[in-house]
Amino acid sequence: MNRNPDHNTFPNITLKIIETYLGRLPSVNEYHMLKLQTRNIQKITVFNKDIFVSLVKKNKKRFFSDVDTSASEIKDRILSYFSKQTQTYNIGKLFTIIELQSVLVTTYTNILGVLTIKAPNVISSKISYNVTSMEELARDMLNSMNVAVIDKAKVMGRHNVSSLVKNVNKLMEEYLRRHNKSCICYGSYSLYLINPNIRYGDIDILQTNSRTFLIDLAFLIKFITGNNIILSKIPYLRNYMVIKDENDNHIIDSFNIRQDTMNVVPKIFIDNIYIVDPTFQLLNMIKMFSQIDRLEDLSKDPEKFNARMATMLEYVRYTHGIVFDGKRNNMPMKCIIDENNRVVTVTTKDYFSFKKCLVYLDENVLSSDILDLNADTSCDFESVTNSVYLIHDNIMYTYFSNTILLSDKGKVHEISARGLCAHILLYQMLTSGAYKQCLSDLLNSMMNRDKIPIYSHTERDKKHGRHGFINIEKDIIVF
């Protein structure tokens, strides 16, 4: 029987806090379930909603000025959400409401509210790069890799983009400047800061407080537009979350990384924004070309890739003094694949102190083998490399999340061989190891190459797990 508690049964202060929050006397079950939430409930109850409404209105005026909604509508949506618990009787939903309201009252001002106050002066730090000089070289490199055969019968998943992306991008530009210790960007927008001719869609980010930021942003969009916003977590992408609207249109996504990982990611400073070092991004691009899907993307829009490649090549030429003369030495390093055990052996002794690298195509197998080695010095760089690295007895052990392309039966395609070399170089950059000679040889090994057809490719490692999501409208959190 679900009875209401009387005021003599429970401590008066706790009961009063819960009663004030719910706008009613709690049931016995509600009381016992919510009494440990009284601290959060108190913060929500005393939170100044008027100041919060003002901050959201300012955010709307600055970043969403073209969205047709009135100040009174915004206020009504905010007050409605902060009183939602009074009409909710499901304990699970009450916990969700408390958790999300707690995020708003404790973090919104410092994360998004601060974007409305006067910003520090922008420190202009751009260098003039001669990207045009690299366009022909980039085109030649990419042309030799444009070997994917498009299966016209293959059904491609559609990536629907919200009309709010341009508004969120405007907000993100300011966010990246204000929070440049905890949030950095990579991808097309970061290269646009170097070369304004680059086209970009949404802004790709790495940050240390991704979940909190995305929740705050989701509510900002909800309060301004009135739309139901959903946050999704994808199991096969590490620490990745995406915001979509009620029609499944993509708004923004983010990878979360630890602060110690953030500290070692190579980055450069442009106009008060930190971007992932384009050298590192170039290595990631070379690595990703081992993925058959990425080669299919190249086949569909080579000019998009050419603009990015030329920008990064000019950056490494200017920054590292790379000479593009075709001298490749021992690049790409020799790669031998064991297709049955799904391990590639890369001969590294010509460049590094470890004599070889065992590249696993199944992450669970690598984890098991590392345990068997009884070694505890592995480095996990999370989504930055999608892999751990371990050097033990002069052998590097690592995981490669992409496909391996074969040019013949049992023979690693040179595109994948370069991708594996790039994967090893990412580790060198992250650990401040030597990489420049290897980088020079790797880039020169991409020059003047003939197209080599793809014979076959390995399958990607299958990732398991359930999708997580936060549905604000339905008060559901599943993680």
Curated annotation (Swiss-Prot):
Changing residue 10 to L: In strain: Bangladesh-1975 and Garcia-1966. Ca(2+) 1 binds at residues 202, 204. Heterodimer of a large (catalytic) subunit and a small (regulatory) subunit. Its EC number is 2.7.7.19. It is an enzyme of class 2 (transferase). It catalyses: RNA(n) + ATP = RNA(n)-3'-adenine ribonucleotide + diphosphate. InterPro entries: PolyA_pol_cat_Poxvir, PolyA_pol_cat_sf, PolyA_pol_nucTrfase_Poxvir, PolyA_pol_nucTrfase_sf_Poxvir, Poxvirus_polyA_pol_cat_C, Poxvirus_polyA_pol_cat_N, Poxvirus_polyA_pol_cat_N_sf. Belongs to the poxviridae poly(A) polymerase catalytic subunit family. The active site is at residues 202, 204. Keywords: ATP-binding, Calcium, Early protein, Metal-binding, mRNA processing, Nucleotide-binding, Transcription, Transferase. It comes from Variola virus. Gene3D superfamilies: Poxvirus poly(A) polymerase, N domain, Poxvirus poly(A) polymerase, nucleotidyltransferase domain. One of its GO terms (biological process) is mRNA processing. The keyword Acyltransferase does not apply. Induction: Expressed in the early phase of the viral replicative cycle. This is Poly(A) polymerase catalytic subunit. SUPFAM superfamilies: Poly(A) polymerase catalytic subunit-like. GO terms for molecular function: ATP binding; metal ion binding; poly(A) RNA polymerase activity. Polymerase that creates the 3'-poly(A) tail of mRNA's. Ca(2+) 2 binds at residues 202, 204, 253.
